[in-house]
Amino acid sequence: VGQIHPETGLPVVAERFGWTAVFAEEIVSLARGDERIVGVTAAMQAPVGLQPLADEMPTRVIDVGIAEQHALTFSAGLAFAGMHPVVALYATFLNRAFDQVLMDVALHRAGVTIVLDRAGITGTDGASHNGMWDMALLAHVPGLHLAAPRDEATLRESLRTAVSTGDAPTVVRYPKGALPEPLTALRRLARGAEEPRAGKESVHEETPHVSAFDVVDVLLESRPPAGGARILLVGVGAMASQAYAAGRLLEQDGHAVTVVHPHWVIPAPAPLVTAAADVDVVVVVEDGLVDGGIGSQLRDAVEEYQAAHGATGGSPVFRRIGVPRQFVDTATRAQLMEDFGMRAADIAQAARRAADGAAGARTDQDLRAE
């Protein structure tokens, strides 16, 4: 760990985690071009990557001490005064300030950006430092937008969108550790036709206009075999790489599979909802709490969409993969991902089983129709 702060126990000098280093570089670049941007943190200025900004622009970073609640209320005040605060915290410590996010920031639609470092499984940092609660909690905050980038490019893009949003709170979350290899999108889904497709023949067709909050990248797409169940794998944030690898395994098996990565996951993007409504199986993989997380939010959104549009083709089978509702033991991130079935092979197997179940249900429906 190296030298630590005697009060917080955090490293005095930030380790060169890939995600944190990219944030540190990008926030300096953004601040150079926008004098409204100011960094705020709670006794973790160096570990979260705000030190380079403080070194270059000392008056543009405020460390409020071990006071996350104050950091959020203070940032709301800065936003009301015309600034755009970027509050950088460890994800687990945002739990302390949920009331302030809800009542001081979101209620007033304050343009505050919250950057959550060490989101998801942190492993050897211990049970208290797993940043697994944020998405399940923040999904219930009206008007809030949350991004979960998959790599360096999408992290930079999400930060640019976040600091340009002045009428709502934005959150950008990423895990501890090295950046994964970049994944190039084949195409992007966009907000399109409102009616669900009969026969579930295609995931979704592109349309030319899409809000930044509705961006969904298609990472892998294989054509469906006749009569086979269509599988949609949704990789949330850094889990997109595992979802992509699982999609490759399913493709080798001859399954019809599409792998997507939504840049912003709260609220569920409209193109993702319509895509999920058009398939037989949806598997959502997230580095966070399963109960109430992104998979749960997407499932509810699909049900509402189908009810609103009178869909008659049946609901997709949902499988949610992530962190169970428990305090997580101290272990390596790799070991915990294996324990929770979050590796590519586990994801592929869960999708296969769900596809078998969907095929059986479809056969039963056909027999009843006769």
Residue ranges: model-predicted function:
Residues 1-26, 32-55, 63, 69-71, ...:
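Thiamine diphosphate
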Residues 49, 61, 68-88, 97-101, ...:
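Extended, hydrophobic alpha-helical segments in both membrane/secreted and soluble proteins
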Residues 64-65, 89-90, 148-151, 285-287:
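Short beta->alpha connector loops at strand-helix junctions that form conserved
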Residues 100, 158-159, 271:
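Short beta-alpha junctions and helix-cap segments that line functional grooves
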Residues 148-165:
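Conserved glycine-bearing catalytic or ligand-binding loops at nucleotide- and phosphate-handling centers
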